[in-house]
């Protein structure tokens, strides 16, 4: 590991020289590319330098203990040595995590799809609350939220909502939200005051560039129809709504929220591209997973990942056994505590797999 880190540090120093070279600065594209590479290596190099400082501290303390010391000073040196050894183990693990292969999608924007599951109107209201939760989280991160498609229920819930979140590292933080979210509470539609369980399914897809997925025109069946609002309001007089069927996979995308057919088609294609990318990736993933046997907690859509219990004010993430009594704060977008714990868990699992 040390040799690998030394090579990375040398590369980092080389990049440092290049990005301050006037000739490179005069080539914006090249300079930007090198800057990105430099900032990707920075956290590893900084952690490696911290690690080297700890090794120096250990060496100095051990050398001191080989000399004649008075009792009090020896005790202090031993304490410092123990602290440094503990710190060395922590930083070693952090370095191993930093050296893990990066998910190529981590820096991408995300397309999120939330669908009401079991529970009728109550599930649709819960889907709307999840949409608000992710929107508030995006606000906290200074990310941008753009609604792409909605299907509303009678009580202003969502049967389905598709939206894009754009911002640095959006996919790296939100990818663990894929799966079935469950709510336990007394529904507004329930007069008897009994607790009901409803569900909503969340899918998190990285935004995909045109070049990453090839879509052939002959594989598409495109229909247009008149868009209609909830309860027949704002009915469009022209056929601006678009439905696209990808014949080879059977994936269907409908968009009707935009005023023009052209804008709805663009949005539908963006969603289709992301779904196809996800579809082909999941086929690939299944092949890999069948060779490995650790299929728990990887964001399978059919897997129940989290429960939001209103009577107890509790949120439990079942994949990592984490329970927090912070329901209100979490639904208001304070998701970092859960997401950080999930990232740590899955990174540790990957370290075990690598061995």
From Swiss-Prot:
Any one cellular-component term (Gene Ontology): cytoplasm
Record keyword Protein biosynthesis present: yes
Localisation: Cytoplasm
Domain of life: Bacteria
PTM entry text: Methylated by PrmC. Methylation increases the termination efficiency of RF1.
Pfam families xref list: PCRF, RF-1
Keywords attached to this entry: Cytoplasm, Methylation, Protein biosynthesis
Modified residues annotated as N5-methylglutamine in this record: 233
InterPro entries linked to this entry: PCRF, Pep_chain_release_fac_I, Pep_chain_release_fac_I_sf, Prokaryotic/Mito_RF, RF-1
PROSITE patterns in alphabetical order: RF_PROK_I
Signal peptide stretch: none
Single GO molecular function: translation release factor activity, codon specific
Matching NCBIfam families: prfA (TIGR00019), PRK00591.1 (NF001859)
Function: Peptide chain release factor 1 directs the termination of translation in response to the peptide chain termination codons UAG and UAA.
HAMAP family: Rel_fac_1
Family, per entry: Belongs to the prokaryotic/mitochondrial release factor family.
PANTHER family found in the cross-reference section: LD18447P
Protein name, UniProt field: Peptide chain release factor 1
Species per Swiss-Prot/TrEMBL record: Caldicellulosiruptor bescii (strain ATCC BAA-1888 / DSM 6725 / KCTC 15123 / Z-1320) (Anaerocellum thermophilum)
Gene responsible for this protein: prfA
């Amino acid at each position: 590991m040390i040799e690998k880190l030394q090579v990375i540090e040398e590369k980092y120093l080389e990049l440092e020289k290049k990005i301050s070279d006037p000739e490179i600065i005069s080539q914006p594209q090249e300079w930007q590319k090198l800057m990105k590479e430099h900032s990707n290596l920075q956290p590893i190099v900084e952690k490696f330098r911290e690690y080297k400082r700890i090794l120096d501290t250990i060496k100095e303390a051990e050398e001191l203990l080989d000399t004649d010391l008075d009792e009090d000073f020896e005790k202090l040196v031993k304490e410092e040595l123990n602290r440094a050894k503990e710190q060395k183990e922590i930083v070693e693990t952090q370095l191993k995590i930093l050296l893990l292969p990066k998910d190529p999608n981590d820096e991408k924007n995300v397309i999120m799809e939330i669908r009401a599951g079991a529970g009728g109107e109550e599930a649709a209201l819960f889907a709307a609350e999840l949409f608000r939760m992710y929107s508030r989280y995006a606000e906290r991160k200074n990310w941008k939220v753009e609604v792409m498609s909605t299907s509303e229920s009678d009580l202003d819930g969502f049967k389905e909502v598709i939206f894009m979140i754009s911002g640095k590292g959006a996919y790296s933080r939100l990818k663990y939200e894929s799966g079935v979210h469950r709510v336990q509470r007394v529904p507004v539609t329930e007069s008897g005051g009994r607790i009901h369980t409803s569900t909503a399914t969340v899918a998190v897809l990285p935004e995909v560039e045109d070049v990453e997925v090839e879509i052939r025109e002959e594989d598409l069946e495109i229909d247009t129809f008149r868009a209609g609002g909830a309860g027949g309001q704002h009915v469009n007089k022209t056929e601006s709504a678009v439905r696209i069927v990808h014949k080879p996979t059977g994936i269907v995308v409908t968009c009707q929220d935009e005023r023009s057919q052209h804008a709805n088609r663009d949005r539908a294609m963006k969603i289709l591209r992301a779904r196809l990318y996800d579809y082909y990736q999941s086929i690939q993933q299944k092949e890999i997973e069948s060779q490995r046997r650790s299929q728990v907690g990887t964001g399978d859509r059919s897997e129940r990942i989290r429960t939001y219990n209103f009577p107890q004010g509790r949120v439990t993430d079942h994949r990592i056994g984490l329970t927090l009594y912070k329901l209100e704060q979490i639904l208001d977008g304070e998701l970092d505590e859960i997401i950080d714990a999930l990232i740590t868990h899955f990174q540790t699992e990957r370290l075990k797999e690598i061995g």
